[in-house]
Amino acid sequence: MEGFMDSGTQTDAVVVLSLAQAAVLGLVSENELFGATISAEAFYPDLGPELSGAAMGEPEPPGPDVYQLACNGRALEEPAEEEVLEVEAACEKHTRRKTRPPVRLVPKVKFEKVEEEEQEVYEVSVPGDDKDAGPAEAPAEAASGGCDALVQSSAVKMIDLSAFSRKPRTLRHLPRTPRPELNVAPYDPHFPAPARDGFPEPSMALPGPEALPTECGFEPPHLAPLSDPEAPSMESPEPVKPEQGFVWQEASEFEADTAGSTVERHKKAQLDRLDINVQIDDSYLVEAGDRQKRWQCRMCEKSYTSKYNLVTHILGHNGIKPHSCPHCSKLFKQPSHLQTHLLTHQGTRPHKCQVCHKAFTQTSHLKRHMLLHSEVKPYSCHFCGRGFAYPSELKAHEVKHESGRCHVCVECGLDFSTLTQLKRHLASHQGPTLYQCLECDKSFHYRSQLQNHMLKHQNVRPFVCTECGMEFSQIHHLKQHSLTHKGVKEFKCEVCGREFTLQANMKRHMLIHTSVRPYQCHICFKTFVQKQTLKTHMIVHSPVKPFKCKVCGKSFNRMYNLLGHMHLHAGSKPFKCPYCSSKFNLKGNLSRHMKVKHGVMDIGLDSQDPMMELTGTDPSELDGQQEMEDFEENAYSYASVDSSAEASVLTEQAMKEMAYYNVL
């Protein structure tokens, strides 16, 4: 202890403090000059200046006033006797050292600008700071603040500043533009980046085992790395002034903010990876008429109403489509295109064609579809010049040309699978008199029709009815005739209830109930519903009577009159009135009788309803129509296999006339 009091050999115990730390302790002001020396007087204010450099008498253990701090007057607990002895031993150790120069105070500078060679650390023995301290000093040691991080070696003794430490809080960096000279790296807690230029990566310690992610925190080079097991741990970060860009924030608020900032950094990283800087200025604006301007692309001259659409369009030229479908992973340039595409997965088709009611997901598809209903065909074949509404149709058509399977009409451009179909189609462009019969000068559109017609002149009838022995030149004529033997009349008029064997006869009959009579005779000005009825009527004005009876030689101008006459030779009157005993050889005569005598009209041979009245129908028109139908349906129902030769000749003649009137 005597050596400790010797002023000749004893130097003052000094500690390295920065200006900020000295200002916090109340030792110096912030305007203090560099190189100031802090002596033991600052820590022991009760010792006068006369005792600082002279030998002291008996050494006495320091009392409570010795540990009184000048900044706020808070006193520490009195150290134990063992601690006093350790302090004395430490002071004796300093007596054997050489005189050291005054220690410079380190000014408060930014961590990234502090050099290693500018820092000097000295070992200082301070009362109450021993590793064997009692339990009373343990909490204060554990709560040591930012001053602990300024010492590199575990052997360096630190001053207990727990009385001046604040409550542990979390640092949050203020959003601002980073400085260009700072190389800020994104935070990754699992994969820390390697050290650069011998300096550890910037980091800040949380009050727990995990590190706080920060973008602008830098660790000065004189601090020990966090992985050093001997380095003192920082349980509470040192308060930093607001001018450094930090604000205080509680841990719960920080977690909520970092969750959103992480998403923003992820989006920003995606945009950064594009590595494309699109600069759009007013030079992209072009006049669009009506004092409107549009943003026009300089690569394809396509224009848009908004600058954003132009930017996404330019990115599309570079193959960048940032919007992906979650269902099929298809990429799109704009979010509106993605929303339209999602309608296909939802089954929604809002755009409908007004002509055929076909629905589409996009208006562009509907517009392209409308070309099918118009004469506009923008896609033309370079082989034959035929136009198409869709490019897919054009491609499929050109494939037929290349494979030789396409037979195209030179008049209208239609294609056919076979050459026969093409030749038949060409006949429609060459007029109605291409194929003409040499026997009767009748013309036909197709060759097959002329060939069937020539069978009538050659008297070739290969199709024979098994019921009555009637022969027909075509199979469909036999099928129609066979229905008359079955008595099946499946087609019924909805107006008058009359039944028909053939649907064509029923449709022709339905025209009688309409008020439209477009066909008129130029001789008597009588009007008719059907063209065929007018042709039949014209025979009345002709002096020629082509229908002649083979039995008596009587001639008739209409076929049904000849058929009725033949019933007289046979002695048969098959049509009987249901109201009286009158019989008739023709159904038309029976109908006329029922209309005049009884005021009703019969329904048919098998179903005669006397309650059905004929209203709004011309009797002559009805009789003529019924006579035509009677000829087609019932003319041959009374011929038998063992008929005479005359009847057979008559039947053949009737068949010829039927074919004559059926062909327009």
UniProtKB/Swiss-Prot annotation:
GO molecular function: DNA-binding transcription factor activity; RNA polymerase II cis-regulatory region sequence-specific DNA binding; zinc ion binding
Zinc finger (C2H2-type): 295-317, 323-345, 351-373, 379-401, 407-429, 435-457, 463-485, 491-513, 519-541, 547-569, 575-598
Region described as Disordered: spans on this chain: 121-141
Full protein name: Zinc finger protein 710
DNA-binding in keyword set: yes
Record PROSITE patterns: ZINC_FINGER_C2H2_1 (PS00028), ZINC_FINGER_C2H2_2 (PS50157)
SMART domains: ZnF_C2H2
SUPFAM superfamilies according to UniProt: beta-beta-alpha zinc fingers
